[in-house]
């Protein structure tokens, strides 16, 4: 008899991140695979640049959520 192999459940590679703005220190939640540039809500500095797939994060990642 063949044993049944354990079926792994796929998990997404994308996450939500808590990012700190390098200019004003404001913390904001962003998506790791953002397709649109994200600006800081306080000072307007771009925190994330779209790079086609995974976004390039300019600010400091404080926490990975989820």
UniProtKB/Swiss-Prot annotation:
Matches recorded under Pfam families: Ribosomal_S27e
Cofactor note text: Binds 1 zinc ion per subunit.
Record-linked SUPFAM superfamilies: Zn-binding ribosomal proteins
Source taxon at top rank: Archaea
Gene3D superfamilies: Zn-binding ribosomal proteins
Zinc finger (C4-type): 21-43
Keywords: Metal-binding, Ribonucleoprotein, Ribosomal protein, Zinc, Zinc-finger
A GO CC term attached to the entry: cytosolic small ribosomal subunit
Family: Belongs to the eukaryotic ribosomal protein eS27 family.
Subunit structure comment from the entry: Part of the 30S ribosomal subunit.
Name of this chain's protein: Small ribosomal subunit protein eS27
Source organism (scientific name): Saccharolobus solfataricus (strain ATCC 35092 / DSM 1617 / JCM 11322 / P2)
Gene that this sequence comes from: rps27e
């Amino acid at each position: 008899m063949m044993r049944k192999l354990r079926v792994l459940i796929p998990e997404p590679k994308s996450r939500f991140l808590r990012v700190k703005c390098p200019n004003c220190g404001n913390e904001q939640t962003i998506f790791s695979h953002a397709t649109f540039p994200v600006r800081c809500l306080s000072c307007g500095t771009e925190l994330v640049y779209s790079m086609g797939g995974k976004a390039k994060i300019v600010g400091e990642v404080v926490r990975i959520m989820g």
